Amino acid sequence: MKKLFTFLLFLFFITKSFAQFDTEHWFAPMADASNGSEAQQYIYVSTNESTPFKVDIYNNNVIIGTINNLSKGSPQKFYIPREYIITSNNTEINAKATLGLHLVGEKKFFANLRFSVFNHAEILTSKGKSALGKNFYIGMGEQYLPNNAANRNGLNAIASVIATENNT
């Protein structure tokens, strides 16, 4: 019984460890309240496939770039122009937009979006096709706006969800 439980536990963790390993990945658009033009953003992709392959990067169903020769031991970066992923225009926030990225590879790969502004950086990891569905759960901690740590009304939080298919 103990061996069976250990095997099932191991099997559970192994299947979950590849949840971010897929042939397609999506990144939702983001908003920049500071309108920082010094921001840098890029896609970082890696794989455990030994045969090199390519990954196409789409914005609004148009290819904006291609990563070539992705293979095990040779991760790649692709710098993303700001207008494809980040907006500071208030009319585009909470509205249907043409921002966001869709990555499609010939084989399975891991993908994350890395970006930074003046004094802050983030890494967003895509779950791939395993994130498709109709039920989403969000959990986050409180984040105070700058110079408002004592003001409980100065909270800031963000959740970004992207619909990749109709009726999802």
Report each predicted region and the residues it spans.
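Conserved functional hotspot residues at active sites or interaction interfaces
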Residues: Q20-T168
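Bacterial Sec-dependent N-terminal signal peptides
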Residues: M1-T23
